[in-house]
A protein has these predicted regions:
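Vicinal oxygen chelate
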Residues: 15-23, 51, 71-148
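N-terminal beta-strand motif that seeds the catalytic metal site of vicinal oxygen chelate
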Residues: 5-26, 82-83, 87, 138-148
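Short secondary-structure boundary/capping segments
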Residues: 40, 48-49, 72-75, 115-116
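A generic structural signal for short beta-strands and their flanking turns/coil linkers
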Residues: 14-16, 46, 55, 79-81, ...
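Core segments of cupin and vicinal oxygen chelate
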Residues: 20-64
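A short local loop/turn or secondary-structure capping micro-motif enriched for an aromatic residue
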Residues: 58-59, 65-69, 142-145
Length: 148
């Protein structure tokens, strides 16, 4: 399942590792593996690793961090803290379609932001089944990520 298991920038010299809590490992597995398309790595009965678009996330049983919509971006208040990923636009579009097909409830519907400006990007916010917010941004090229 999924078309994003291969996702990795050719120039990437390192990758990040992030560990956070989920309340149900099986629900989380289904979402990260079957909806997001992340390949599962090692696991025990209390945690599971995933290849999250070329980076490692570890989901551990526990209570997720409190989240509030306190991050202002343009006219929107977005969940803080949140996990985020940057993709190229074609991959972002494909993921948005996968999420819609899975009836994912969006915190912020897929949309373009800063249109026609440096750093133009597509963005969407959603939560995993345990309530952890995730933002995925899409750019036309890697060079646009840090434009100002």
């Amino acid at each position: 399942a999924g078309g994003f298991r291969w996702y990795r920038r050719a120039t990437m010299q390192s990758l990040f590792h992030l560990a956070y809590h989920v309340t149900d490992l099986e629900q989380a597995r289904k979402f990260y593996r079957d909806v997001l398309g992340c390949a599962e790595g090692r696991s025990t009965e209390t945690w599971v690793d995933f290849n999250f678009f070329g980076h490692q996330i570890s989901l551990h049983l526990g209570e997720p961090f409190p989240v509030t919509n306190t991050g202002r971006v343009g006219n929107h208040m977005v969940p803080m803290p949140h996990l985020g990923m940057v993709l190229l636009k074609p991959d972002w579009m494909a993921l948005a379609e996968r999420l819609k097909a899975a009836n994912t409830q969006f915190v912020l519907e897929p949309q373009v932001r800063f249109e026609g400006e440096p750093g133009e990007q597509w963005t969407m916010f959603f939560r995993d089944p345990c309530g952890n917010p995730i933002e995925v941004k899409g750019f036309s090229s890697w060079e646009q990520v840090y434009e100002h």
